[in-house]
Amino acid sequence: MINAVGREIPEEILKATGKEAFKGVYAYDDYEYKKAAPTVRTLNDPTRSKLVENIHDALVKCGIKDGMVLSFHHHFREGDYVVNMVMEEVHRMGIKDITICASSLGKAHDPIVPYIEDGTITGIQSSGVRGKIGEAISTGRLKNLAIMRSHGGRVRAIESGEVHIDIAFIGAPTCDEYGNMRANGGKSDCGVLSYAMVDAQYADKVVAVTDCLVPFPNLPASISMVNVDYVCVVDEIGNPTKIATGAAKPTTDVRKIMMADYCTKFVVNTPYFKEGFSYQTGVGGASIASTISLGKIMEERGIHMGLGLGGITTPMCELLAKGLVNKLVDTQDFDQGAIESIKTNPNHFEISASEYANPFNKGAYVNKLDFVILASLEVDVNFNCNVVVGSDGMITGAQGGHPDTAAGAKCTIVIAPLLQGRIPAICTNVTTVTTPGESVDVVITDYGIAINPRRQDLIECMKDVDLPFCTIEELRDKAYAMVGTPDPVQFDDRVVGVIEARDGTIIDVVRKIKDYEFEDEQ
């Protein structure tokens, strides 16, 4: 079946998953459904302890068995130890056919690849994957389909019962003996625990894993004791130097600075740039530079940001500290400055991933965005974006909040260099669609700026602005003229992954990379 972005979704995949093909960004607006519910085991006896000796003990008490779904969060980023720690014990116990439902997986989790190859892990559901896990999926070593969801889409899948978590393992920088978890106050602080909140609410069993047990009550709790079955104290839940790598610094790359300046000039010439506007940006060099340059103009003009949203970096926190931002609303901290800010600034708030981006609740924060500044591996002439699959066909990234914020914001801006190395980032067709062009308004490159023809209002308000505007086709043609038209990636027929739109429909599939055979030279 051909979906709304022109991608062919095999009928057998639709049948196997019980899914529909993507129909459009707002196809499920005003949709009514009934939420799922976990199985809860009560605790009335005040003498019964939640503390367990180790991960093995936690698994046994939770009734671990073949075929279960285990969940994890990624707030520790590349410093995470929890996934590997748990899966090593699952493997040692001889448990098979496990599905990992994680908010994201990274290179820190490369050690679990052998467990994919031996059948300990047969399913992965995540925002995305990097490193050797991505290679394992792309080369067909995962038994079942990998399912990629946005941050909002993951919450939707859990709350609707599409995914049922048997055991959630939640790494907590601090926790008390009854399970009240906080993201701060320990030796492995990560700022917030937003992605894990839905796991705690909907999993049948919840295990808090901490390296800093604190006196009861650990308040204010990010995750409450009422949702926690067991508490496991371990030596380390993460490497703090990789959880927070220090203050994000502005880029010195001239090309990125130029794109950031283009972005800022575009933003301030829209009708949305006014007192109390809302804004989200990513952690990339150009995005950080655009936040800094925007802050200077805000200060000059006396304009305040009403809401700063999303994954938070130090430059946004500095704007908050200067009084240029009224409220920061946070689902992930990317550096030490952001972690310190949420500890100390009363106008810096933690929210759940559902509040942030769930398309199946009664209204998420992303719907209130004026601007979102995003990056992309590829953008095609229909403004579709690819943030998951590399130009070599390998799964190498994550949807994150990309489709969620693009769908919600009044003005979605994607910053991408015209070329990624020798590979055109602006192309005829992206390798894989992860964010539909329907929700992308502007593409800013180092060689020009293209406005989506759907947005005639933006085209009109930019007619007298001195910026290098062109069509998206002209950008594509410039890229191809410089490095040639790229050869398409060669894939097998086998589908190894599904890219879900945030509403749970299938926007694209990922196929196995074709094996190459080389003939011996005679």
Walk through the language-model features, giving the residues of each.
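Conserved alpha/beta enzyme-core scaffold
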Residues: 1-522
